[in-house]
Amino acid sequence: MRHSYRGRRFNRTAEHRKAMFANMSAALIKHEQIVTTLPKAKDLRPVVEKLISLGRTDSIHARRLAMAQIRDADMVKKLFTVLGPRYQSRPGGYCRIMKAGFRYGDNAPMAVIEFVDRDVDARGKDSGPTAVETADAA
């Protein structure tokens, strides 16, 4: 019986799961909408909601806690300067999950996880050219 087991393992080690959710959290904060499998989206939502609740109180301690979770300085900055003030008056429920059909290769259920009141222009926005691309252009 699997009574009182919280979360899913996703056939990954604990370190791999932690890194996966850190990367997915950073991607969601960056693009404000990502497409992933439904179980991953369901497990990602509480992680991101707690981060946004941290972002509502801008303090050094909260920034360090967020940095330990996300591990991306630019996304922590966006969390505290853009997302925190945006959801200051909302008591919770910062993300929504919408089902998006099934993946072609393995028929896995897919979902779109996005922020409520999201910035539509942030979707698909890249961080800019990399050092390799600028070296190739020169």
UniProtKB/Swiss-Prot annotation:
Gene Ontology MF annotations? structural constituent of ribosome
Keywords in alphabetical order:
Ribonucleoprotein, Ribosomal protein
- Cystine pairs annotated here are none
Q: Name one GO cellular component term.
A: cytosolic large ribosomal subunit
Gene3D superfamilies noted in UniProt: Ribosomal protein L17
Q: How does it assemble?
A: Part of the 50S ribosomal subunit. Contacts protein L32.
Q: Which family does the record claim for this protein?
A: Belongs to the bacterial ribosomal protein bL17 family.
The answer on whether this UniProt entry bears the keyword Ribosomal protein reads yes
The gene designation is: rplQ
Q: Per the UniProt entry, what species is this protein from, by scientific name?
A: Methylorubrum populi (strain ATCC BAA-705 / NCIMB 13946 / BJ001) (Methylobacterium populi)
Q: Does the keyword Ribosomal protein apply?
A: yes
Q: Report the Pfam families cross-referenced here.
A: Ribosomal_L17 (PF01196)
The opening ranks of the lineage are: Bacteria, Pseudomonadati, Pseudomonadota, Alphaproteobacteria, Hyphomicrobiales
As given in the record, the signal peptide range reads none
| Entries under PANTHER family matching the protein | LARGE RIBOSOMAL SUBUNIT PROTEIN BL17M, RIBOSOMAL PROTEIN L17
A single GO BP: translation
Q: What is this protein called?
A: Large ribosomal subunit protein bL17
